[in-house]
Amino acid sequence: MNKHILEKDVQQFIKANREKSPTEIALKKSPFPNVSSAELASQIDGWQRSVKKLPTWAYSEGIYYPDKINLEQCSSEHTALIKQTLIAKGSRVIDLTGGFSVDSCYIAQEADEVIHCELNEKLSEIVAYNATILRVPNLICKATDGIELLKQSEDDAFDYIYVDPSRRVNQGKVFLLEDCEPNIVANQELFFSKSRYIISKLSPLLDISTALSSLKHVRYVYVISLDNDCKELLFIQERGFEGETKIHAIRLFADQIQTFEFTYDAERSAMSRFSEPQDYLYDADVAITKAGAFKSIGKAFGLSKIHQHSHLYTSENFFPEFPGRVFQIQQVLPYSALKKNNPFVQANIATRNFPDKVDLIRKKYKIKDGG
């Protein structure tokens, strides 16, 4: 961490040039003897990456930005807010995998103390400094291995363990928990000896059912999406819990949260109805489909599926609160009709469980994108 970057004239330069191309800044000579043009470009790039993802950081004076990869890997403030809601007031929390501390800072709004463990000493120093700027005095930064610190702690030293394991390099196409560091499957007994709750942030590539077979005492699974893009999975384990896991599919918006809850037992027992397309077509959000609520969502809204494997739904009724996209059906045509008389010069095209891909349809029938 180059503390000269925090000097007033350097900060003024960064603020005055933060809308410019970082590459342009990097290619020019630095006006400061102790701060390189590459460092200036890195800070400007960090601000630009944070404007939408981390507005609290971006619009706080004097924030020090880490390497690009740390910003790419960190949570957004949208998803960090979900973790905050999981924490009881007055708790003691340890974040085993630290990073840029977005989740830790939000968790610290509820907890009495959050121990932030980060092996990268430079990043740990940056986080500790930024915590003073953001006024998070209960974030305690330790430049150390979180697992080793946990082993040295007393039993029940914490109320929550938070962990965001990273996938080890050179693994196969199948995403397995055992391929991650730290290995939360192998360390479950250690974790439960130190804390009642374990909150694991996991990749949306992970198969939820496979993870549930590897993890013990899972009370909740959260599937979180933003703009119909699945961002992360949260597994909440509670020591001694033996009940049925509840699945929460969560859609995040700029100013609200939409949640759909179900269980896999209820999903297995639900029966789907089928019909031809009616007045409205319903396309469930990715949080719903990733969670696996294919029959539960149809049952909840009284919808019929148009095909067993397409996961598109239809109804005579309009439900504005449906978690996904809703289209009013104007006309239903057989695909073969396009060969005889194609009425579309320009259109948005989407397919489900269909042999021809979108690009092929556009090429075959000369349909431009948009509509």
Stretches found by the model and what they are:
Residues 1-371:
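SAM-dependent transferase fold signal centered on methyltransferase-like domains
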